[in-house]
Amino acid sequence: MNTLGRFLRLTTFGESHGDVIGGVLDGMPSGIKIDYALLENEMKRRQGGRNVFITPRKEDDKVEITSGVFEDFSTGTPIGFLIHNQRARSKDYDNIKNLFRPSHADFTYFHKYGIRDFRGGGRSSARESAIRVAAGAFAKMLLREIGIVCESGIIEIGGIKAKNYDFNHALKSEIFALDEEQEEAQKTAIQNAIKNHDSIGGVALIRARSIKTNQKLPIGLGQGLYAKLDAKIAEAMMGLNGVKAVEIGKGVESSLLKGSEYNDLMDQKGFLSNRSGGVLGGMSNGEEIIVRVHFKPTPSIFQPQRTIDINGNECECLLKGRHDPCIAIRGSVVCESLLALVLADMVLLNLTSKIEYLKTIYNEN
């Protein structure tokens, strides 16, 4: 399927080397001021070609809004938008058009659909994630109206872990590093991978918090069984190319702890810790929502690799083209956008949780 969300639904379309990619965001309430500067900035954060640590492919990534906006406000109807592909180079893939690139989706897409779109991976390309960032910008505009902000940064590259988290520094960092002291070592790890015609994995940290420092997030976003907030977050993140694991709060470390070590104790002011990552019973508990997203190394590397062609013959694959040496860097921005989309969807879902909410709306009329 090509749709994310239930009440705020994003449907995406397009391929890496097609004329356009785009999306339809359905369910956006009317009356939200469209922040074009925010939209442009979000696209630039994900944009390639900015430095040596990401792909050289630099698309303009101008978002063309085709519907759902009138006089700079959302109308309540589906927001349609297009992003033009202007710098695709399909010739870079001529030498591998009948080969399966190791650890790419070529193999599974071919066997599922019987079509070999060799041009940059087609629909399975990370190029599609630009649509999610654009849609995430609209979701952020909605969340801002109720005091919620999403942030992201890199906490690990090639096993080099951040010891401190500074989201303001991440905005200034070429690799969105959260720890300024570890940034140079992380950059060196990427540069060494590039020198060796290789790639490297990484981990992004995504969080949602209240815009005001003295306030909490809304309690009760999500539902207790089949629309659990943490499940929907994990689903959205795992749907992104290259993501191999998602943790909420302490995540994997939770399995190593005793209950007395893990439990978030409480007093009259609230929780004394946040090992749960802001989610209890599938619903937000008011604390910051903390998500860690683990990315595999980019499968596109410039080393000879053993593979097979579409006829099953063994052969050697040597790639050309423009690729991210570490997909976690730009991927962190996409994950931030996905968290915004999930939270906006849960905010709209929550309107049905109490009759008082409906009475508030309809008694005013």
Swiss-Prot record:
GO CC annotations on file: cytosol
Keywords annotated in UniProt? Amino-acid biosynthesis, Aromatic amino acid biosynthesis, FAD, Flavoprotein, FMN, Lyase, NADP
Q: Which cofactor does it need?
A: FMNH2
| Protein name as annotated | Chorismate synthase
Coiled coil location:
none
Q: Say which domain of life the source belongs to.
A: Bacteria
Q: Which GO terms describe its biological process?
A: amino acid biosynthetic process; aromatic amino acid family biosynthetic process; chorismate biosynthetic process
